Amino acid sequence: MTLREVSVATDLSDFYDLLVIGAGPAGMAAAVEASASGARVAVLDENPRPGGQIYREITRNSPDRRTYLGPDYWKGQPLAEAFCLSNVDYASRATVWSLETRDKTAGQARNVVGVTVAGSARMVETNAVVLATGAQERPMPVPGWTLPGVMTAGAAQIALKAAGAMPAGPVVLIGCGPLLYLLASQLVDAGVPDLTVLDTAQSPFRGAVLRHMPEFLLSPYVLKGIGLLLKVRRHAQVVYGVRSIAIIGSQHAESVRYAVGQGERSIPAKSVLLHQGVIPSTSLSNAAGCELQWNDEQRAFQPVTDHDGRTTKAGIYVAGDGAGIAGAQAAEVSGRLAALAALADLKLVSTQTSSTSIKSRHAQARRFLRGRAFLDALYTPRQSFLAPSAPETIVCRCEEITVRKLREAIALGPPGPNQLKTFVRCGMGQCQGRLCAATVTEIMVAEERKVSPADVGTYRLRSPVKPVRLAELAHLPHTARALKAVTGRDPVDHDTTETGHIL
């Protein structure tokens, strides 16, 4: 068996038993598990090669980058190799822009997925979809965050993994979370000089943190975490307890002004890397109508799922960080669990086989989840960064909506983010709210004070969840329904050329 690479949309089959969206650890694991049971499987992924964000370019990176990418990165190699040997259709550089469910009827698939590959779009039918779309960085709007030279820590790590590109110094990393220190450690190992970390985390001596410490000390993450912190403190300047940030510059980032203790300080900066944790990527699950719930520990919305990844929509499963932040190893296990659940629901494996495998995978998952609650509590962002207060700070980058404009609109009384769109175009740009949704919810909560994010809610998305060109839609087959919708005549009255154009 070997992977079948799909380079154009027409090479995809009309139907698959299981469609996996995303080729990170969860997506690759789900595909390997399902294909091994004989299911017809396709994987659709935006990246040029498998691996997702955590294992980006794992199939191509050279050993000379092993030093600074670290052992956790190379742990993904066996999974990537298994994926490349699996009997799966794999479409890279594929944009999935639609996921629609329909009532199950005889001879009809439950789900229809809209995807663009190599500039042409098509619809693919499947009875089961595993959403393995991973996580996205939580936005961190601060004054000056739209200046050239400012990017997220995740973007800098992508450049490091994909091309070995280093940020120009002086480099200032700002925020909190494990990824911030992982990137700082990788930059140290890569030889980047003049490195400063401005840690915005709250005090580690809070009750919520201390309560989970005993479990964390028994987790597989404790030694790794201590090692990262010690290395970064040895080789970089680390400032703890940072309460506010402003990035200064006219045409490019030039310095960072920050508040710590009782005063303010300023340091020069040419590259500023922002990060305050990651949150589940829920665009497709949201648009498909899957119920979302608020996770107060992770300060994020996530799909409602059972222990095996089933959502509230039959035939849709969520695996990996898209279901809740848990890390790469837990994501791999959850991908296998979601695939096993889908296979069982489709009756492609026996109940006894799936039950035995699922029980074994749950035992693995519990080990990788141990200590997660401690990390969530330790790196809960400060409210001042979740809901920025500086009036001219831009929240919605697409439409250039500032904190001031948002507050003025919120004062008019909209009950949630969707109604807020009536007053300002926040969330209506090309990213469709992916970069501002979390901040808008937090600002509305901060303004109301006595409500929870669960009460405020988040944007309700519709397909297409990604921008689609008219030329791409023109490549869609002219179905009977489409022809009648456009012309008002029954399909039998039309003559079409081989390319499908209406005559």
From Swiss-Prot:
GO terms for molecular function: oxidoreductase activity. Keywords: Oxidoreductase, Plasmid. Its EC number is 1.-.-.-. Pathway: Opine metabolism; octopine degradation. To T-protein and to dimethylglycine dehydrogenase. Heterodimer of a subunit A and a subunit B. Oxidative cleavage of octopine into L-arginine and pyruvate. This is Opine oxidase subunit A. The gene is ooxA.
